[in-house]
């Protein structure tokens, strides 16, 4: 038995499909299947039920998967400890980002991070919050940048900046001549939302419910750009995070208005595993991003004033 065998086993448990598990491990399906059989022979127990086309684990298999996850997490800690013996801000770093942050934040921070930490090899991974937290817990990710939610409280959260949301309406909307919109004005309105799984959806829904607004259930978007295009087409209104909003008040048929009483906002944070030996690395990374984004958010706020 070796570490790679445990990685195959955990991948199979996560994907419940031999080909997809093999692809995630960058090996052929016969290789992965053969190693799982060898693992069963070595342990003397059946890990999988082979009476169905589905991947079903036996009770012994499920127990071993959980133990394998624990072992892989400890291996990750050992690698981090070894990494700490060199330069703190050098070597590979796997960073996860949510889709409503990544495309808009990365152009702001990546050039700065390359200049500040030229020896840091950054690998970027985009996924929804629940997927990022699972990958962070398993050790596949070193840290993640996301909007703080209840589920992220199990990790160390380092706040980076607060991101206000703006109301996006089509340019011929009756409110288009306003300078800003009170949240109470949304009472009775129906807003376009992202599909389930996006934390921004839950946050925007919370603000809408507090204001007496509701969701327009005729359509749910897979991305912020789809939401923006639906608004431009006159299909509805929505809340968008300010990093995704252009500097112009009106662009491509969409008018963007600040909201107040209260101002809807979310907190973007860097999160990492408790007890990680690379805590100093993550804190230094967070400090750099926070300092850079504080100036950027101040500029955005001044433009909206």
Swiss-Prot record:
GO cellular component term, pick one: protein-DNA complex
Record-annotated HTH lysR-type domain positions: 1-58
Keywords in alphabetical order: Activator, DNA-binding, Transcription, Transcription regulation
Binding region for DNA: 18-37
Known function: Required for the induction of a regulon of hydrogen peroxide inducible genes such as catalase and glutathione-reductase.
GO molecular function: DNA binding; DNA-binding transcription factor activity
Entries under CDD domains matching the protein: PBP2_OxyR
Keyword Cell wall biogenesis/degradation (UniProt): no
Protein name, per record: Hydrogen peroxide-inducible genes activator
Superkingdom per UniProt: Bacteria
Organism (species): Dickeya chrysanthemi
Pfam families from the UniProt entry: HTH_1, LysR_substrate
InterPro entries per record: LysR_subst-bd (IPR005119), Tscrpt_reg_HTH_LysR (IPR000847), WH-like_DNA-bd_sf (IPR036388), WH_DNA-bd_sf (IPR036390)
Family: Belongs to the LysR transcriptional regulatory family.
């Amino acid at each position: 038995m070796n570490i790679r065998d445990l990685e195959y086993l955990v991948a199979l448990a996560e994907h419940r499909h031999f080909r997809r598990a093999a692809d995630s491990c960058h090996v052929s399906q016969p290789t992965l299947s053969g190693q799982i059989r060898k693992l069963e022979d070595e342990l003397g127990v059946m890990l999988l039920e082979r009476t169905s086309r589905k991947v079903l684990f036996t009770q012994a298999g499920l127990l071993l998967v959980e133990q394998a996850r624990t072992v892989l997490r400890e291996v990750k800690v050992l690698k981090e400890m070894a990494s700490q013996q060199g330069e703190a801000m050098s070597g590979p770093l796997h960073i996860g980002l949510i889709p409503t942050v990544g495309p808009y934040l990365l152009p702001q921070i990546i050039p700065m991070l390359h200049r500040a930490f030229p020896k840091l090899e950054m690998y970027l991974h985009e996924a929804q919050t629940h997927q990022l937290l699972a990958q962070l817990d398993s050790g596949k990710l070193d840290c993640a940048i996301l909007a703080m939610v209840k589920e992220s409280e199990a990790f160390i959260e380092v706040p980076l900046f607060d991101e206000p949301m703006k109301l996006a309406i089509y340019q011929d909307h009756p409110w288009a001549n306003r300078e800003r919109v009170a949240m109470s004005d949304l009472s009775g309105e129906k807003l376009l939302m992202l599909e389930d799984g996006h934390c921004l959806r839950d946050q925007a829904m919370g603000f809408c419910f507090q204001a007496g607004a509701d969701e327009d259930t005729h359509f749910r978007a897979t991305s912020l750009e789809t939401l923006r295009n639906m608004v431009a087409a006159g299909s509805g209104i929505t809340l968008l995070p300010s990093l995704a909003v252009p500097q112009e008040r009106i662009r491509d048929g969409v008018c963007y208005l600040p909201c107040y009483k209260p101002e809807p906002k979310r907190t973007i944070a860097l999160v990492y595993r408790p007890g990680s030996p690379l805590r100093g690395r993550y804190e230094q990374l967070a400090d750099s991003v926070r300092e850079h984004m504080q100036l950027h958010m101040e500029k955005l706020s001044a433009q909206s004033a």
